[in-house]
């Protein structure tokens, strides 16, 4: 069954009073200011204070440069005014000027009128629930934890809003914001730790399904290329000899021919539906391995983007000669820009730039004068990657979802409506592979308590 989406909550006042001069803790409005409109879950803007310790890369830098470079969702003029008006402070005190430098041990506070991006209004589906765990079907485009511009529009906060303020969900595995599918939520620490041990111990089999460019080869395709994190800030990972060991088994489920133009010429290369079985859990493992094989996920905003990787989309690239150029292009356009994987051909660049400009509505917020964005399109709400099934290696439990709509046969075509039960390449003792999974990052531990660890995923 699916969790019922809450009705629009209590109306918020049209006017929100300004925050006090010094705010040291984030506000916590309850009930959460959600409302549903045009198929999207929206959050009414609210005042909020971010508090963060100075990062190593910030030390000795001017405060205006830090905010302009690190937080690109607002223009430089906004941050200049926020510093001068005391909305951005250091250790509870206003900065002397926009050129003030920060040092180790400083705590930076930023009080702002927060505008969260809308996410899909699709409810969080419940695959299974008992006294210990909730197994959910995470919608694409919804982050697991509050991060970046997302706070209440996150899995943790949406479920808390539906189940009560005191309820503390403990995510065990983590999916990327753009990825959908099976996720485990612990109801208490012991249950979360038990499943975490299984994930870290590699006794859980994971099955994903992806929609990729072109005609993927038939048969089992095994990719064992190591993966290196090139830029944590940009979320960029690539195949590199100096990276961490990684292994994925792929199996094509279907190939669909491209549409024909009026002249009868094929448009594009068609696409394949691919079963993905990660044997390790590197960040972006499936996305990076599929790119390396020359079949990136069709709408992947990073790894299927010709504006970033060029004509060959990073196929079979193992050297670092173009890393700096790739990072520059990705940073310049923003990894979540409208182009995503659309601007494949040179003639589409102009169209992309037009769409990019249309992201801004031209309107300003009445309270904070922040430029307002238009609603995200379908291509910004997720990618064609879905965690379909998680199963205990010893057969004690198994949870799976149906295929997402984008993986079903298009009209007029025949193809699988469910994943086919081929011989399973994972029918081995996974723990004996001696491939070290990544340890959970700080972000992955954000929803845990008392040192609980979360297992990294391969998405």
Predicted regions, residues:
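Short alpha-helix capping/helix-loop boundary micro-motifs
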Residues: 92-97, 270-273
């Amino acid at each position: 069954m699916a969790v019922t989406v809450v009705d629009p909550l209590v109306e918020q006042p049209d006017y929100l009073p300004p925050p006090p001069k010094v705010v040291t803790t984030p506000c916590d409005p309850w009930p959460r200011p959600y409302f549903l409109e045009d198929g999207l879950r929206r959050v009414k803007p609210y005042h909020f204070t971010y508090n963060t310790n100075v990062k190593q890369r910030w030390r000795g830098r001017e405060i205006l440069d830090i905010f302009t470079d690190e937080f690109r969702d607002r223009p430089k003029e906004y941050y200049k005014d926020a510093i001068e008006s005391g909305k951005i402070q250091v250790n509870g005190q206003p900065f002397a000027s926009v050129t003030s430098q920060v040092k180790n041990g400083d705590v930076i506070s930023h009080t702002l009128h927060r505008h969260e991006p809308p996410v899909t209004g699709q409810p969080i589906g419940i695959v299974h629930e008992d006294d210990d765990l909730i197994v959910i079907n995470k919608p694409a485009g919804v982050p697991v934890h509050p991060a970046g511009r997302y706070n209440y529009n996150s899995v943790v906060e949406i479920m808390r809003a539906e189940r009560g303020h005191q309820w503390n969900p403990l995510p065990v595995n983590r999916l990327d914001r753009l990825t959908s599918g099976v996720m485990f939520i612990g109801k208490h620490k012991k249950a979360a730790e038990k499943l975490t041990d299984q994930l870290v111990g590699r006794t859980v089999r994971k099955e994903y399904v992806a929609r990729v460019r072109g005609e993927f080869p038939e048969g089992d395709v095994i990719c064992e290329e190591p993966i290196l994190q090139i830029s944590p800030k940009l979320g960029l990972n690539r195949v590199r000899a100096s990276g961490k060991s990684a292994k994925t088994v792929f199996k094509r489920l279907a190939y669909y021919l491209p549409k024909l133009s009026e002249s009868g010429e094929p448009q594009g290369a068609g696409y394949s539906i691919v079963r993905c079985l990660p044997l390790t859990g590197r960040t972006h493992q499936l996305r990076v391995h599929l790119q390396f094989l020359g079949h990136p996920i069709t709408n992947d905003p990073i790894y299927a983007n010709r504006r970033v990787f060029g004509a060959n989309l990073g196929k079979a690239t193992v050297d670092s000669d173009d890393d700096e150029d790739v990072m520059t292009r990705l940073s310049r356009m923003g990894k979540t820009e409208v182009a995503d994987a659309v601007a494949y051909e040179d003639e589409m660049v102009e169209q992309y730039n037009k769409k990019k400009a249309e992201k801004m509505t031209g309107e300003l917020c009445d309270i904070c004068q922040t430029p307002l964005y238009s609603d995200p399109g379908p291509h910004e709400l997720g990618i064609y990657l879905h965690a379909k099934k998680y199963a205990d290696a010893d057969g004690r439990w198994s949870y799976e979802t149906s295929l997402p709509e984008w993986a079903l046969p298009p009209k007029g075509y025949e193809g699988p409506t469910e994943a086919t039960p081929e011989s399973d390449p994972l029918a081995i003792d996974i723990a004996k592979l001696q491939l070290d999974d990544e340890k959970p990052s700080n972000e992955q531990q954000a929803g845990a308590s008392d040192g609980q660890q979360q297992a990294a995923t391969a998405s």
